[in-house]
């Protein structure tokens, strides 16, 4: 079965996300966990969350994709911004327990002149620290592939694998089933992967 949906606005609440998906024949959807430009998240309305869960269960929804705000930069040169990113992610994990078995997608960050290796190291550190804080969660974390603009890390499949390998090393065990990848086709095309002419080869390389 094909799982298909699109990014929706949370303006009509959590139940509204499920209802909108049903209206267009979708069986999943994506949404921002908070304002994409950052800031404090709205308190979860538990009744609203229960209504969404009911819609998802009754209609056999696939896991939904929650997107972290763009302001999250786990490999910033500023320690304060790195801590802010970590605490924001921990908070989002707690909030997503109201929508069990979600996928939580985030941009691995920009190294801001420190170099890709430093950026990869810092982001992997944050991932391991987050999982040490959210031991009992049904949410799976996804590293989004990036286009490599500016000082973005995660442009190549090799860089994404480095982040995962280092995160597992620092966590002390495998994160299989808890950490994965969001393959953003727009980003990888912009980053140089020819998915138009050689999609099968690109997917094989990714695997």
Label for each model-derived stretch:
Residues 55, 163, 205:
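Residues that form generic nucleotide/phosphate-binding pockets
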Residues 74-180, 190:
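Active-site acidic/histidine proton-transfer and metal-coordination neighborhood
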Residues 15-18, 42, 116-120, 153-157, ...:
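Conserved strand-to-helix beginnings and helix N-cap segments that scaffold or border functional pockets
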């Amino acid at each position: 079965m094909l799982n298909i949906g699109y990014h929706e606005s949370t303006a009509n609440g959590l139940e509204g996300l499920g209802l909108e998906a049903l209206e267009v024949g979708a069986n999943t959807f994506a949404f921002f966990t908070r304002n994409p430009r950052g800031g404090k998240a709205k308190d979860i309305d538990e009744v609203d969350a229960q209504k969404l869960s009911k819609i998802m269960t009754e209609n056999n929804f696939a896991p939904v994709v929650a997107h972290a705000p763009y302001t999250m930069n786990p490999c910033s040169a500023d320690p304060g911004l790195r801590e802010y990113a970590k605490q924001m992610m921990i908070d989002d994990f707690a909030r997503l327990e109201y929508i069990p078995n979600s996928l939580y997608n985030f941009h691995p960050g920009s190294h801001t002149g420190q170099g890709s290796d430093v950026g990869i190291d810092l982001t992997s550190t944050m991932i391991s620290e987050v999982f040490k804080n959210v031991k009992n969660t049904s949410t799976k974390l996804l590293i989004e592939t990036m286009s490599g603009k500016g000082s973005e890390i995660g442009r190549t499949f090799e860089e994404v694998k480095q982040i995962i390998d280092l995160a597992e090393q620092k966590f002390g065990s495998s994160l299989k089933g808890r950490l994965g990848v969001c393959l953003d086709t727009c980003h990888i095309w912009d980053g140089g992967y020819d998915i138009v002419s050689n999609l099968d080869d690109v997917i094989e390389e990714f695997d």
